[in-house]
Amino acid sequence: MKEFLTPELADIQAAGLYKNERIITTEQRAAIKVRPDSDVLNFCANNYLGLSNNPRLITAATEAMRTHGYGMSSVRFICGTQDLHKELEAAIADYFHTDDAILYGSCFDANGGLFEALLTDQDAIISDALNHASIIDGVRLCKAKRYRYANADMTELENCLKEAQAQRFRVIATDGVFSMDGNVAPMDKICDLAEKYDALVMVDESHSAGVVGKTGHGVAEQFDLYGRIDIFTGTLGKAFGGAMGGFTTGRKEIIDMLRQRSRPYLFSNSIAPGIVGASIEMFKMLKESNALHDKLVDNVNYFRDKMMAAGFDIKPTQSAICAVMLYDAKLSQDFAARMQEEGIYVTGFYYPVVPKGQARIRVQLSAGHEREHLDKAIAAFIKVGRELGCIK
């Protein structure tokens, strides 16, 4: 295998697609250090509410480990369920206004273990073309008939639903916020079509929960769809503290069946008590105040408006993801490298992560960013943008 992998790795490197991991030597926050001892402002983390280093969550994690131990050494159905796990599942269900919730090691596992457990070859899954890789992989593991519609294209979705009418069940699967463009799925229209064609609706809230909606409660709040979305999946690794862990929440019968049949749930260790305890505390914090969400919204609006005024081409967004369009792959790499020299940590994305000719810098805003952080990033964008001929 070595003889095969070595030239393939060389090809990846030659194509400029090799992924190098930058080493961070501080906690995850707005201002970080990366090796070799470089101070940068972080604009590429999923730390939307700025909770990754929150002292209250660290204290809660420490206390949970003191009372409930470091790890579970078991899957849930043997001896891996503590009272903390049930408390967190109840908090998730309460947050999303659903019947029940089930925890996974990651949202990748939640999506990977969803469809196979519920659907057969008599059923159909209709999936948005820009859905996350975990949904794509989950669909591949399932025997249901597969349909795909162009991103947020309701005409194509309706055509797929018409084609799938002979199937027993139809499930529409979509991200709430699409991670590369930052656009919010048109959930109101999706739910209308689901009702018209008798389909279930599943939405991955990984980039939308904690972010979109009047108080950050996600797409159901944004579009007033409580009771009309059947299945939510999501992560504890982004807005909700940034540690790890995923979940599925929805109707009781669906969650009960996942506990019986979902393979990543049945055959993976339970989430560690420290993460569970901190996550419970995080949901308490979000119940007490909307201040973090309000600050995030202010930061997004300020950054987007200033960047557009400077002449940058910004994808429309209602999320914390701001796509600065550069279109050329090499330009996106050069731009990101120059930004790091200016003390701003951003990432360039290009084919095959995004379509050819759609290269961009993806900026992720956080409630952890202060106004001076935003101003420094905007000034760096303008300086580098002028140097590289992106703006006048």
Can you annotate each of these PLM segments?
Residues P55, T59, E63, T67, ...:
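PLP-dependent enzyme catalytic core of the Aspartate aminotransferase-like
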Residues V75-T81, E89-G113:
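Short loop-beta-helix segment that forms the pyridoxal 5′-phosphate
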Residues D294-F303, M308-G343, V353, G357-Q358, ...:
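Conserved PLP-binding catalytic core of the aspartate aminotransferase-like
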Residues L114-A133, M154:
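Conserved PLP-anchoring active-site segment centered on the Schiff-base-forming lysine
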Residues Y197-L200, H207, V212-Q318, L331:
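Active-site C-terminal subdomain of aminotransferase-like
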Residues S106, I126-C142:
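Substrate-binding/gating loop at the entrance of the active-site cleft, primarily
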